[in-house]
């Protein structure tokens, strides 16, 4: 039988963790003064005033590296819980994780062959 009251703590946590950021933004929007001026519209980074055009377009190489990083970062997130519960899950979970890693390795080889990892 599906017991809904067992999920009360989950729903309370979800509502509270969703309400805290919303309340923080609302309170900061109400309490902070709004002053518009040229300083607010200029780019400012690391204490250095920009010289010339501050808007630069990033090369596509940065995005490719970021994409490959995200893929393998997500892989690590999925493999860690699997490794911690390997003895409980058994051989079928090992085969599934092996296929998952194999697919990601094939993707890495594909990116490598296409030159996505070359920095030139």
Swiss-Prot record:
Signal peptide residues on this chain, from the entry's feature table: none
Entry keywords, A to Z: Chloroplast, Membrane, NAD, NADP, Plastid, Plastoquinone, Quinone, Thylakoid, Translocase, Transmembrane, Transmembrane helix, Transport
EC number: 7.1.1.-
GO molecular function: NADH dehydrogenase (ubiquinone) activity; quinone binding
GO CC annotation terms, alphabetical: chloroplast thylakoid membrane; NADH dehydrogenase complex
One Pfam family named in its UniProt record: Oxidored_q4
Organism ancestry: Eukaryota, Viridiplantae, Streptophyta, Embryophyta, Tracheophyta
Family: Belongs to the complex I subunit 3 family.
Name of the featured protein: NAD(P)H-quinone oxidoreductase subunit 3, chloroplastic
């Amino acid at each position: 039988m599906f017991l809904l009251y067992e999920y009360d703590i989950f729903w309370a946590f979800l509502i509270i963790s969703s309400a805290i950021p919303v309340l923080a933004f609302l309170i900061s929007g109400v309490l902070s003064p709004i002053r518009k001026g040229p300083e607010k519209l200029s780019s400012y980074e690391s204490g250095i005033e920009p010289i010339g055009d501050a808007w630069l377009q990033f090369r596509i190489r940065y995005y490719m590296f970021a994409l490959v990083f995200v893929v393998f970062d997500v892989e690590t997130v999925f493999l860690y819980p699997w490794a911690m519960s390997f003895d409980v899950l058994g051989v079928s979970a090992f085969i599934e994780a092996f296929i998952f890693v194999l697919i990601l390795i094939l993707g890495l080889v594909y990116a490598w062959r296409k030159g996505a990892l070359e920095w030139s």
